[in-house]
């Protein structure tokens, strides 16, 4: 359990562990410049617990901005079941709800890739330093050393069947 209240558990093995090191050197390897992280997707339905975003965490997709107020997520059977907080929670709820294809569609609320930043050249404060242009920061914000990347939505990159535009990436 983290000091902020994050207490998330999940099983792995259904999907591969993927690395991004900044260049594609073999056929079929997805990568982008500024890489330096490792991630995987939890087994379907296995994620349970609580995730808490704190001020200073980064919503890299879709907004490319720092979190301003705490957001608490409750996760059961691989899906977010509750989003509590202020403006940042409302932004997340609205974005994920808008990504649904029907009232029964839960895909935007599914836990997607989870990873860790490992690039000593990536800067947590890059958005504050250079502005919030997504094309400049989406890679580096995912890879600054020590972050845990939490995301929702699609899992097709890892071989899954969930393809939704309701995608959220938050390096914490």
Locate predicted features.
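Short polybasic amphipathic segments
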Residues: 1, 71-83, 148, 172
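Active-site bordering "gate/hinge" segments
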Residues: 1-52, 56-69, 76
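Short helix/loop capping segments that flank catalytic or ligand/cofactor-binding pockets
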Residues: 8-11, 18-21, 60-63, 82-84, ...
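Short, glycine-/Ser/Thr-/acidic-enriched flexible segments
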Residues: 15, 56-58, 79-80, 87-88, ...
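Generic structural signal for beta-strand residues in well-ordered domains
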Residues: 44, 73, 104-107
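Extended interaction regions within the primary functional domain
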Residues: 45, 49, 113-115, 152-156, ...
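Dual-mode signal for accessory low-complexity, basic/Gly-rich regions
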Residues: 66-67, 82-152
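Intrinsically disordered terminal and processing segments
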Residues: 145-172
């Amino acid at each position: 359990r983290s000091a902020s209240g994050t207490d998330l558990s999940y099983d792995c093995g259904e999907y591969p562990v993927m690395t991004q090191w900044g260049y594609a050197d073999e056929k079929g390897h997805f990568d982008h410049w500024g890489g330096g992280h490792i991630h995987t997707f939890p087994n379907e339905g296995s994620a349970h617990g609580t995730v808490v975003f704190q001020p200073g965490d980064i919503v890299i997709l879709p907004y490319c901005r720092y979190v301003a107020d705490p957001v608490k997520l409750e996760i059961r059977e691989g899906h977010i079941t509750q989003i509590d907080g202020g403006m940042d929670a409302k932004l997340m709820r609205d974005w994920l709800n808008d990504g649904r294809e029907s009232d029964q569609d839960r895909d935007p609320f599914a836990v997607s890739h989870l990873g860790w930043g490992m690039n000593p050249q990536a800067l947590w404060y890059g958005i504050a330093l250079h502005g919030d242009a997504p094309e400049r920061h989406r890679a580096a914000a995912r890879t600054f050393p020590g972050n845990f990347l939490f995301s929702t939505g699609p899992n097709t990159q890892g071989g899954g069947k969930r393809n939704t535009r309701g995608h959220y990436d938050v390096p914490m």
